[in-house]
């Protein structure tokens, strides 16, 4: 059994149709797993199901052999699962440090220790700690979002389109930071449209089509799979 997994998840929003159908995903600690696929494939929905943001009609979500399918999103955060949404993931009117402090609101210990660890991972945040986040570049704001999510020292980090809207150079830099986070032992699941680049840093990947598992394998296997390349990588 993997460290964190969603098993045969089926569900949608409210009373609407199912968006994911018998979808299964898993990740180990110290691993990056990418969820890929065309628009409308259910990628973000699968992630949100694992976060408890929609009710599953069937299937389960398990972390460290504990079934958390009935846990609320807040309880899942307390269990060590952190999430960076694609948009509205920082407080633009607050400083870098204030954003990190908000990310650590669940902590009972001295958050300065954790903040300093975040500064070591993301040196630019230390440099700009007193700057208002709304004045930062897109890539720097994403680093703030990552840092804030890491303030609970999660065992699982879920990222929804972390490189959306940034330049190729900034995308490469963000992926380098994500790899650094992985090396601390965090299990990382990310939804990405930049499939080639995501697979190049991923230990494993899943390709979803209409909410179902279509392909899965190591990042290298998926990059080299002719059908995956033709259908999803534009090659």
Stretch-by-stretch model annotation:
Residues 2-235:
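Glycine-rich phosphate-binding loops of nucleotide-dependent enzymes
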